[in-house]
């Protein structure tokens, strides 16, 4: 079960709700999670999205996801999925904070370049696969009449 609060400008409410609902019910159905998704200008930060926890760093259950406003639909969905992968990493404990430093497994990721951080590599690898899975499972990739038989 999760709680979702959205705010900001330049986003599609139904898409945000739909992607989040699909991801949370598929990958974390038994966890009680509080999600706050804020849409705002992030261009100065040179990012499309951020994910951070808002409560206890040992077992975080409240998260803030910030997303760039006015993205294309595909980029928006992929970015939201990417940040939700980080939520899953925090919840399952593969990403954690210890003594003020962030770790992925036993690797201190703060000394690594962003592109080399293992939790980012995992999220980037999964975002494309999960994006396609989302489109297929929600019927957006293939309209019902054109869907391959094994997907009906």
Model-derived features with residue positions:
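Hydrophobic or amphipathic, alpha-helical segments that drive membrane association/targeting
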Residues: 1-11, 33-46
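Surface-exposed helix-capping loop/turn segments at secondary-structure junctions
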Residues: 26-32, 94-96, 134-142
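Active-site scaffold of zinc-dependent metalloenzymes
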Residues: 40-75, 90-91
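Active-site recognition of the HExxH zinc-binding catalytic motif
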Residues: 78-91, 123
